[in-house]
Structures are given as structure tokens and as C-alpha cells.
Swiss-Prot record:
This is tRNA/tmRNA (uracil-C(5))-methyltransferase. Belongs to the class I-like SAM-binding methyltransferase superfamily. RNA M5U methyltransferase family. TrmA subfamily. Gene3D superfamilies: 2.40.50.1070, Vaccinia Virus protein VP39. Dual-specificity methyltransferase that catalyzes the formation of 5-methyluridine at position 54 (m5U54) in all tRNAs, and that of position 341 (m5U341) in tmRNA (transfer-mRNA). S-adenosyl-L-methionine binds at Q190, Y218, N223, E239, D299. PROSITE patterns: SAM_MT_RNA_M5U, TRMA_1, TRMA_2. InterPro entries: MeTrfase_TrmA_AS, MeTrfase_TrmA_CS, SAM-dependent_MTases_sf, TrmA_MeTrfase, U5_MeTrfase_fam. The active site is at C324, E358. It catalyses: uridine(54) in tRNA + S-adenosyl-L-methionine = 5-methyluridine(54) in tRNA + S-adenosyl-L-homocysteine + H(+); uridine(341) in tmRNA + S-adenosyl-L-methionine = 5-methyluridine(341) in tmRNA + S-adenosyl-L-homocysteine + H(+). The lineage of its organism: Bacteria, Pseudomonadati, Pseudomonadota, Gammaproteobacteria, Enterobacterales. Keywords: Methyltransferase, S-adenosyl-L-methionine, Transferase, tRNA processing. GO terms for cellular component: cytosol. The gene is trmA. Pfam families: tRNA_U5-meth_tr (PF05958).
């Protein structure tokens, strides 16, 4: 497999191998059979980063082989969205003959949406000035005239220049409703939009008929918060990354949702607040005791939940856990399964043709643990 080719004829086989591996990992927890959610076999990634190689008069995207570190020229990126591939060709054609855009260009990042928007970030090993801005604006206008809904950003050491804005608005149809998600350049977004919709709809199905309020840790830009808000009286969500919190507030307003509250703090800090170990100014205007959270939703980083957070999570009757690392998920389940039973299990093929697996579990408190 190379970035320009994918073994599409082996897609089902690689997915079956992941499903078998997950099944084996979940045997100890008596989990039900996993629901399997397939990715598109090609053109599934909505974002991509490439180094830029200067070869005399030529200029092209490259990646490095993860094993040999050999340089690989990339003219077509089969995992990337059709818009990424179209823009890759447009950018190289435009930049090669233009010294102001080409000089010491080091990297190009692409962020695209299913709704046809794109942010292209040009990263340089030199200062950027007004001449660069004017030249970049000319390229932006030329591409817009050809129908591209595009934004440009220039980055250099301690410098970020954006001509209009530094984000795109993604529009996803989730269980019959269209949701708007601001996605800010250089902040986390779900890379596989199709699988993201599957995850959102699975989470909605898992919380059908839920009671009371929802507590969410690691909410990002409100990806799950906004979709799940329809099933709960109120949603209280935490996130530590400043850009993601700003995007979450934007998304709440854009979708006219009035029952979601975002707090900028880490899961560990929120655990301390819930245990009344520390007081936080950020929670001053929020009456935690007024929330009737019967369900908690967690989508932690690869490291999973720390021990204190696992202990806090166990207090909730229903736990919805999205994991990008089955190993840390299993480590957490070794504790959570003492008080809760896995009612649902899902495998989301977020990264086809790799060993990575995205999983979802719904845990419900055992009657004996009440």
C-alpha cells in the first residue's frame, strides 16, 4: 500500500481481521457481538498534511515511508477526499512559477468538508509579509472564481496570517437533522466524516429513551454534544483545548441549541470539582447539584481515563464510551465491568488499512451495584 494506491479489494478482509481482534479483546468482559460500521474504501479522509519538496524547477507533495523513511512523491492521495485531491493539483500548478508563494515553502495542510469547503495552510521557513498576503489573495480569488469555496492561511515562526477566516463549516446530516460544525484549522476534528456520522447515529440510538441530563468529558468542538442534546434535558460538557471550546460555543449558536453548557476544564479537574476537592472559578456560575445526570459520555485521548476519572464515571447508571485505543479501553473496562455490564459494542473503521480501531461501548450499571 502507498499513499497513491489502496488495496480496495482487501477492504473487507482487513475489516474482518479488526472485528476478530476486537472480539478476542472483549471476551473477558462478556460483551455482545459488535456492530460493524464500514468506511468508504477510498477518499474518506477530510484532512491531510504533506511536506513540500523543492527539486530545481519542480515542486511537489511528499510523505515519508514510516519504515524506511524514504521520500515518496504524492501527486494523488487516494485516502484523501476528492476536494483534497483536486486542490493538491491546483496548488502545485499555481505555486511552482510564483516565487512569493514558493520560496521556502515547507508544508501544506488541507482541511476539507463534505459540504465543499476547504482551508489550505501554507507553512514556511521564512517571514511572511504584505507581498505574500497579496499574492496569496490573488490565488484565493482565482480559485474561488473557478468554484472552490476556499480559505488560505500562511504560517511561519510565531506568525499566522489568515485572509478571511481560519475555519470551515461542516454540515452533517445525523438521524434526519443537519448539524453545522465549525472546524478550526490546526485543532482536532474527526478525520473520517462518513464514520463520524455513523458514530453520532450509534450514540443517538444508544441513548434513545434516556432520562435526565448528560455529562460529557472531552467534548471537543461539541461533535457529540450537539447531536445528543435532543435526547436529554440538559448537557454539561467539558473540554480543555481553547480553540475547541470556542468552536463548541459557535456550534451551539449556529444550531440554535439552548440546552448545552460548555466548561473549559480537563476531565481530571472536573473530577476534583465533583469530589469537592477543589473549587474552580470556571464553575462559579454553574450549579452542579442541579444536574440530574443519569448518563455520562466520555471520548478520551489514546491514554484512556485516569484512575480517578474511572472511579467518578462509575457513579453513573449509564456510561457511553468512545475509544480510539482498544488497549486503554480494556484497561478501563477491567474496573468499569465490576459495576457495569456492556450492553452495546461497536467497531468504527475510522482508519481503513491500518491497525487502528475506533470502538464504542454502552455500559449499564448492574442491579447488584446499586
Amino acid at each position: 500500500m502507498t499513499p497513491e494506491t489502496l488495496p480496495i479489494d482487501q477492504y473487507e478482509q482487513q475489516l474482518a481481521e479488526k472485528a476478530a481482534r476486537l472480539r478476542q479483546m472483549m471476551l473477558a468482559f462478556q460483551a455482545p457481538e459488535a456492530q460493524i460500521f464500514r468506511s468508504q474504501p477510498a477518499h474518506y479522509r477530510m484532512r491531510a498534511e504533506f511536506r513540500i519538496w523543492h527539486d530545481e524547477d519542480d515542486l511537489y507533495h511528499i510523505m515519508f515511508d514510516p519504515q524506511t523513511k524514504a521520500r515518496i512523491r504524492i501527486d494523488h492521495f487516494m485516502p484523501g477526499s476528492p476536494l483534497i485531491n483536486a486542490l493538491m493539483a491546483e496548488m502545485m500548478t499555481a505555486i511552482r512559477p510564483e516565487p512569493l508563494l514558493r520560496a521556502k515553502l515547507f508544508q501544506i495542510d488541507y482541511l476539507t468538508t463534505q459540504s465543499g469547503e476547504a482551508v489550505v495552510t501554507l507553512i514556511y521557513h521564512r517571514p511572511l509579509d504584505d507581498a505574500w498576503r497579496e499574492c496569496a489573495a490573488g490565488l484565493r480569488d482565482a480559485l474561488r472564481a473557478r468554484g472552490y469555496h476556499i480559505q488560505f492561511i500562511g504560517r511561519a515562526n510565531k506568525t499566522k496570517i489568515y485572509l478571511d477566516r481560519d475555519y470551515v463549516d461542516e454540515r452533517l446530516t445525523v438521524a434526519g437533522r443537519t448539524l453545522i460544525y465549525q472546524q478550526i484549522e490546526n485543532s482536532f476534528t474527526q478525520p473520517n466524516a462518513g464514520i463520524n456520522v455513523h458514530m453520532l447515529e450509534w450514540a443517538l440510538a444508544a441513548t434513545e429513551g434516556a432520562q435526565g441530563d448528560l455529562l460529557e468529558l472531552y467534548c471537543g468542538n461539541g461533535n457529540f454534544s450537539l447531536a445528543l442534546a435532543r435526547h436529554f434535558d440538559r448537557v454539561l460538557a467539558t473540554e480543555i483545548a481553547k480553540l475547541s471550546v470556542e468552536a463548541a460555543h459557535y456550534n451551539i449558536a449556529a444550531n440554535h441549541i439552548d440546552n448545552v453548557q460548555i466548561v473549559r476544564m480537563s476531565a481530571e479537574e472536573f473530577t476534583q470539582a465533583m469530589r469537592k476537592e477543589r473549587e474552580f472559578t470556571r464553575l462559579k456560575e454553574i450549579d452542579l447539584q442541579s444536574y440530574r445526570c443519569e448518563t455520562i459520555f466520555v471520548d478520551p485521548p489514546r491514554s484512556g481515563l485516569d484512575e480517578a476519572t474511572v472511579s467518578m464515571v462509575q457513579a453513573y447508571p449509564q456510561i457511553l464510551y468512545i475509544s480510539c485505543n482498544p488497549d486503554s479501553l480494556c484497561r478501563n473496562l477491567s474496573t468499569l465491568s465490576t459495576t457495569h455490564t456492556i450492553e452495546r459494542l461497536a467497531l468504527f473503521d475510522q482508519f481503513p488499512y491500518t491497525h487502528h480501531m475506533e470502538c464504542g461501548v454502552l455500559l449499564v450499571r448492574k442491579a447488584t451495584a446499586v
